[in-house]
């Protein structure tokens, strides 16, 4: 199943590397990746689209929330994004 995760992070060097490394260590392939600043220039939004089963996605969400530069992780449902 395809999942879309929206991740708010502190806008600092190395954050994308930490997040992509987490996916890599779990053997999870990223199908699509977009990064942009938010209204607050100190915060960036990373949007990741990936395929996997429910259990793996839940584990990724938990692990992402443990990373220091991560502010918030949200799984997007159809219709919640453009």
What kind of region is each of these model predictions?
Residues 1-82:
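A conserved regulatory-domain signal marking ACT and ACT-like small-molecule sensing domains
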